[in-house]
């Protein structure tokens, strides 16, 4: 009997061991941002070869376009362009196709990795998102680009997943906006709101509205002279940006903010500025105000090929005075007028939440209107839903970045957001997850402090980790499985997007990235730039330099041996000139070290003399 028991025990142990071996062989869920909703792991890997083709269905021009984009991205990331073919796939191919599946929704997709990769979706947008997933998995295995065998089903919790950037107070170059579209697409973020006009605070400009900075960033033929001179977008540039975004399934929502934040308009036409509430408010009782704003919106909305190409336009409407009932009713009338005005051009209107702050009797259209729910004191979310508005969750207490301002966030608290937030949390108002009244979420950068030295690179250093984190929370919602620390470590293994390196990362670990014994005039390094956490050292022998003599130059910055104003060591970026209290005298031989990080100005170590 003991022998029988021993045999049974050995058989049980053998079975358990076999089960454990089988379980160990099943591939775990691959890391992707946003995290995959469903994963069924199998055994083994699919390793692409030189013969791997991208196959799309015969006659489907949209999937052909997506196949071409995928091939180009493979070339950018992996230095190989797969062949693109039409028709049926075979073993070793990556096969794109459309397939009805209601459970995947409008943007979902499915991937099956066996001896081939089959990517299917109900719509082309889902196929495109699926290609982003494949690229992210492959770029973590650059030696062989291996993809784990298994099955993916992935779909978003929320339809609008986005970012708003204030280009009014600080000019953001078009090249950066184009890169940001690519970054958003790589992380399945699909909405970019561009805030086109705003102004600084009067108290920082000698309490004088005439001296207070203000800008409108878009070329205007209707009002020549309105457009900012220190940086603007031509109509063609803005149209081309939207076309690029459309190719990547990202929607651009242009915002012309009124009737507050409008100092740029009253600088141009002083009679429409409010004498009572401040020149950054439009005079809502002046008929000329409406003529001006009608003309401005019309310029970008009319015609068969309007400047504002997308389905939605944001009309602003935040932070106007509610000093008395009369102006509140006029504000509500203004809001209703411009909702209907942009709808007259076939656009869906978006507004900032303000109707609790401006509570009144004058009706404001709610049906088919999207409200950016930013502060519950201005618009109580659940009351706004009762009135019929659809909401974008963009609570200021969680999702506002105001660089180096000392209020709101300099960097978002990504750990708290990852662990606790979804778009269902609109400040203290909490909705059921995936409540149809909540269309999605956004985070925002506001450049409140005009001229504070913050550069576009500084802004990006703040937004990129936030985007990676919020991409998860707006797509995957509460279904995350990785602990935050693991997510935060793994997110750094992914690039920003194919061909995009705004962070200036070189390699995956600290170390020497470039060394040259002698640097000849006009020579070039193999690196466009290096990001924060850098140190550059060099030996130099001084000469009688003329002001403006450059030592280094990149597309984004210049470092001067002799700056153009004082003849000192210094650097310029984004229109700011920063100088050190040091210059190199003729005949001096020095070793100079320059360091820069994300929280302080670039600084120079004490130069040491070289013999």
Mark where each language-model region is.
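Bacterial N-terminal signal peptides
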Residues: 8-18
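Acidic, contiguous N-terminal accessory segments
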Residues: 10, 22-156, 349-358, 365, ...
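Feature activates predominantly on carbohydrate-active enzymes
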Residues: 103-281, 288, 294-312, 341, ...
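Active-site neighborhood of glycoside hydrolase catalytic domains
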Residues: 278-368, 375-377, 381-382
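Flexible, acidic glycine-rich loops studded with aromatic residues
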Residues: 363-369, 376-518
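Extracellular glycan-recognition modules
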Residues: 511-572, 577, 586-587, 598
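Trp-centered recognition loops
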Residues: 581-593
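Residue-level detector of conserved catalytic or cofactor/ligand-binding positions
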Residues: 602-611
């Amino acid at each position: 009997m003991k022998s029988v028991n021993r045999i049974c025990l050995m058989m049980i142990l053998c079975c358990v061991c076999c089960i454990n071996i089988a379980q160990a062989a099943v591939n775990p869920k691959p890391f992707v941002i946003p995290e995959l909703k469903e994963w069924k792991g199998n055994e083994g890997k699919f390793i692409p070869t030189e013969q791997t083709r991208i196959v799309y269905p015969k006659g489907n021009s949209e999937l052909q376009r997506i196949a071409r984009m995928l091939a180009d991205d493979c070339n950018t990331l992996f230095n190989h362009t797969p062949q693109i073919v039409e028709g049926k796939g075979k073993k070793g191919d990556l096969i794109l196709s459309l397939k009805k599946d209601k459970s995947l929704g409008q943007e979902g997709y499915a991937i099956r990795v066996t001896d081939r990769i089959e990517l299917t979706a109900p719509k082309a947008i889902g196929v495109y998102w699926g290609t982003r997933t494949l690229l992210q998995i492959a770029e973590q295995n650059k030696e062989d680009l291996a993809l784990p065998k298994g099955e993916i089903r992935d779909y978003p919790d929320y339809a609008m997943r986005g970012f708003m950037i204030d280009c009014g107070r600080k000019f953001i170059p078009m090249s950066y906006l184009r890169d940001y579209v690519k970054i958003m697409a790589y992380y399945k973020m699909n909405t970019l709101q561009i805030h086109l006009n705003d102004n600084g605070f009067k108290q920082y400009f000698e309490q004088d509205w005439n001296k207070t900075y203000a800008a409108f960033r878009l070329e205007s033929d209707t009002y020549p002279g309105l457009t900012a001179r220190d940086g603007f977008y031509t109509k063609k540039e803005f149209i081309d940006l939207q076309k690029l975004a459309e190719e990547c399934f990202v929607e651009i929502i242009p915002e012309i903010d009124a009737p507050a934040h409008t100092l740029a308009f009253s600088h141009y036409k002083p009679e429409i500025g409010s004498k009572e509430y401040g020149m950054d408010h439009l005079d809502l009782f002046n008929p000329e105000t409406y003529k001006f704003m009608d003309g401005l919106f019309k310029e970008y909305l009319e015609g068969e090929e309007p400047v504002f190409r997308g389905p939605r336009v944001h009309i602003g409407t935040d932070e106007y005075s509610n000093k008395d009932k009369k102006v509140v009713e006029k504000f509500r009338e203004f809001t209703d007028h411009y909702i209907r005005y942009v709808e007259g051009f076939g656009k869906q209107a978006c507004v900032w939440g303000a109707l609790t702050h401006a509570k009144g009797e004058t009706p404001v259209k709610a049906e088919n209107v999207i409200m950016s729910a930013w502060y519950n004191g201005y618009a109580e979310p659940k009351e706004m839903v009762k009135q019929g508005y659809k909401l974008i969750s963009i609570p200021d207490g969680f999702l506002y970045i105001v660089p180096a301002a000392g209020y709101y966030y300099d960097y978002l608290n990504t750990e708290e957001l990852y662990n606790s937030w979804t778009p269902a949390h609109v400040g203290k108002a909490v909705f059921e997850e995936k409540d149809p009244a909540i269309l999605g979420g956004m985070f925002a950068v506001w450049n409140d402090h005009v001229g504070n030295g913050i550069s576009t690179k500084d802004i990006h250093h703040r937004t990129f980790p936030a985007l990676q984190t919020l991409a998860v929370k707006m797509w995957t919602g509460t279904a995350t499985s990785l602990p935050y620390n693991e997510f935060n470590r793994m997110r750094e293994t992914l690039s920003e997007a194919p061909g995009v390196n705004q962070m200036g990362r070189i390699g995956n670990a600290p170390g020497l990235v470039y060394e040259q014994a002698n640097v000849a005039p006009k020579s070039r390094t193999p690196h466009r730039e290096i990001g924060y956490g850098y140190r550059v050292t060099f030996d130099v022998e001084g000469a009688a330099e003329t002001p403006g003599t450059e030592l280094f130059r990149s597309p984004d910055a210049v470092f001067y041996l002799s700056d153009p104003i004082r003849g000192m060591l210094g650097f310029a970026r984004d229109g700011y000139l920063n100088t050190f209290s040091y210059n190199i005298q003729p005949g001096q031989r020095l070793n100079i070290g320059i360091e820069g990080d994300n929280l302080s100005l670039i600084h120079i170590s004490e130069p040491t003399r070289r013999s």
